Amino acid sequence: MAGAKDSGCDDDLRIAGGCDPGKRGNPEDSSSPVEVSCSICLESVLDDGTRSKAKLQCGHQFHLDCIGSAFNMKGAMQCPNCRNVEKGQWLYANGSTRPFPEFSMEDWIPEEDLYGLSYPEMQYRVHWCPFGELSQAAASFEELEPATTTYHTEFHGHHAAAVNHSYLAYVGPGPAATPRTSDNNSTDDHPWNSHSNDHFHQLPVAPQYHHHSPSFSLPAAHVVDGEVDSSAARGLPYAHPFLFSHRSNQRSSPAINSYQGSSTQMREQHHAYNHQRQQHHANGPTLASPLISMTRRGLPPPPPPPPMPDQNVGFFIYPGGHHEPETDQIHAWERDWFPHFPVPSNHRTIPSLWHRHF
């Protein structure tokens, strides 16, 4: 019949359900590809190579970038259509199974030790010491101490002799300082070390026996400056303060070590000076004293000092007593370099008058 023939399907196929009345052609044509849309971006999932696609185990297909964004947000591969969770180990774009990179405790510790002893955290190059090692911190503070403008009075080692008196005699201008004694032998940071190789003038000490001088008393020790003529001033280099010591355990100084004489030569100079002093008293004074004494009102002026046997800068020491016993002897500067000088037995308490003579 024509109606049956027009339908394109015979009776057997229609009963079996293998023929669709609204579709013409062979039964093999029913296997043609079907367009599938992505439920995330609502675009067609095509296998044309423009975009990658992913097919889950449930059969639903999505674009690979779309299902990947959903996986990054949820942390699990769950189908947006049927809500089934895919089992298995899924990798993120960074190649890890976790959305963030793994960090261990070692990664959180910085490479640079912030509390190292050599790491400056404070101003002025002060090193931080978190372990209580105060010795290393003190060594760091030594670098911060500026060079002082005053004379240091800690004399130890071979640089100068220690002093027990309350006065300080020095050559040249300089601020006054209070002498202190120290037994420490570390003299590396002493500001005088830079002048240890300089030429030092020897300072001969002229004794006064006071056998021919009238007795007088002074209230305290004075340091009197004499007149400096131009020739002597031009020949004076930078002068350092030198101290006289009366202690038994005296130490050597660079000024004494630089002297090339011996105790025998000093004794010979001492005898020559005594002979010249006797001639000076016999012939009378020939040179007016340039010294200006500072005494109390009403006291007689001190006697003029005798001239020095040489032209070197020197100090005259006038003990405050009169007719002292000559058995009490001390050494000035060094025990082996200078002769014995008579001083009063209580020389540690009686003040003296100091004159500087050029």
Curated annotation (Swiss-Prot):
One of its GO terms (biological process) is protein ubiquitination. Induction: Levels are following a circadian rhythm oscillated under day/night cycles with higher levels during the night. The keyword Isomerase does not apply. It catalyses: S-ubiquitinyl-[E2 ubiquitin-conjugating enzyme]-L-cysteine + [acceptor protein]-L-lysine = [E2 ubiquitin-conjugating enzyme]-L-cysteine + N(6)-ubiquitinyl-[acceptor protein]-L-lysine. Pathway: Protein modification; protein ubiquitination. Its main location: nucleus. This is E3 ubiquitin-protein ligase RFI2. Mediates phytochrome (phyA and phyB)-controlled seedling deetiolation responses such as hypocotyl elongation in response to red and far-red light. Required for light-induced expression of LHCB3 and CHALCONE SYNTHASE (CHS). Negatively regulates CONSTANS (CO) and FLOWERING LOCUS T (FT) expression and photoperiodic flowering. Residues 299-309 have a biased composition (Pro residues). It holds the Pfam family zf-RING_2. SMART domains: RING. It is found in: Nucleus. InterPro entries: RFI2, Znf_RING, Znf_RING/FYVE/PHD. Residues 1-34, 174-201, 248-313 are annotated as: Disordered. A zinc finger (RING-type) spans 38-83. Its EC number is 2.3.2.27. Residues 248-266 have a biased composition (Polar residues). It comes from the Eukaryota.
